[in-house]
Amino acid sequence: MLLSDLSSDQEATGSNSHGGGGGGDRMVVGSHGAAHVVLSNLFLPPAAAAAATMLLPAAPVMVRPAAMAAAQEPRAKKKRSLPGNPDPEAEVIALSPRALVATNRFVCEVCNKGFQRDQNLQLHRRGHNLPWKLRHRAAAVSAVTTAAPAPRKRVYVCPEPTCVHHDPARALGDLTGIKKHFSRKHGEKRWRCERCGKRYAVHSDWKAHVKNCGTREYRCDCGILFSRKDSLLTHRAFCDALAEESARLLAAANNSSSITTTTCNNSNISSNNNNNNINSISNSNNLLITSSSSSPPLFLPFSTTPAENPNPNQLLFLQQHQAAHHQLLLPQFQQPPSSPPAYFDHLAFGGGGGVITSSSCNDDNSSIAGDVMVAAGGDSVSFGLTSEGSVTMHAGDVGRRRLTRDFLGVDHDAGEVDELELDELPADLSTTAAACQGCNFAAATTVACCATDFTTGSRQYLGRLPPVNETWSHNF
């Protein structure tokens, strides 16, 4: 063959000249000890290629070692063992509380000095030139003499029955450890720090605390200094809660003050708007309404003027009074009361005449915001403006004189307006006042009124309320 000059190593491994390993398209066939290389199945006839594929060995399966598999698996975090898990073969020793807290368990017979451990006493005896002996460890004893049995390990249980270390399975393996445990958990705290006042039951704990107490300062945001961090944390738990409560109350106070300011501004704006609206309504409906005390009242009796009125004993004038009240102290309410016009002075005290006045009382205990009095000699009819925006009419002793109901706009008949006897007038007759949205500001507005001739029955209207129905408009 042409490729028979290949080396035996290359033939045995089945690798090509490019360094690639033996693949599925390359086969090494041995015959009588001689190796022959077939490059690829593509160069063989179909029958030979199928036979070569059947002769290929199976691919080797790599088995991962158990150590590598264990190393790659996530190792569970080892939990910390609970204190007091001794050897089952250890010797369990139960000491009394008096023996655990005793400071002079081992006493020197020379100086009567007490020690908690026997080892310390033996070392003390050396100073008195007395015989002493230290207890050797079990490992050292077993190494020297193999004949003597090794002493068992000792564990100590807590004498307190309710303690978890009272169980032998949870016994502590150190005598010093069981002594400190009993003193810390069940003993009296006899040592007190002079700086912070913290108390300790173990003297070594107290000494360690005194060395560091006062060397650091922990400052709260409120400015208080603490020498201990735990005191600062305890304080901040309450300080933060107090700060949040103070901030909430301050925010609520600010909101209430802003709402009050907005309400006052809205009241002033609404009062001005009400005055403007009332002026516009009076101009459109020929009402006698004035919002300024300095200007004289405007009379619009259809087509006549006050100078052309032939009867001087009808409605005389409108007069506005200011109510001296503690709540009406705004600048717009501090205008001086105006006097009636000069051309009505001769009619003010005329015989048989009527006077209409308006007043305001903004009293918290009263539901009437303003009233109107119609007086004719000794007879009177009063109209009250309530806070809900209605007009209440009260009839006095006016004899048999006559008033018309169309003054209030309550006549719903399409015919002629009926006249109502004053004696038959109900005590409280209320109707909604369309133009009385600003009832609290009645002192700044003159009430619309009409005039009636009480002697002859003839009527002369100086003004009227807004039309309530078609009858009101058609009757005039």
Curated annotation (Swiss-Prot):
The answer to whether the entry has keyword Transcription is yes
Any idea which GO molecular function terms this record carries? DNA-binding transcription factor activity; sequence-specific DNA binding; zinc ion binding
List, alphabetically, the GO terms of the cellular component aspect.
nucleus
What processes does the entry annotate via GO biological process terms?
A: long-day photoperiodism, flowering; positive regulation of DNA-templated transcription; regulation of timing of transition from vegetative to reproductive phase; short-day photoperiodism, flowering
CCHC-type zinc finger span = 218-241
Residues reported to bind Zn(2+) 1: 193, 196, 209, 213
Spans through the membrane: none
Q: Tell me the protein's name.
A: Protein EARLY HEADING DATE 2
Q: Which organism is it from?
A: Oryza sativa subsp. indica
What broad taxonomic lineage does this protein's source fall under?
A: Eukaryota, Viridiplantae, Streptophyta, Embryophyta, Tracheophyta
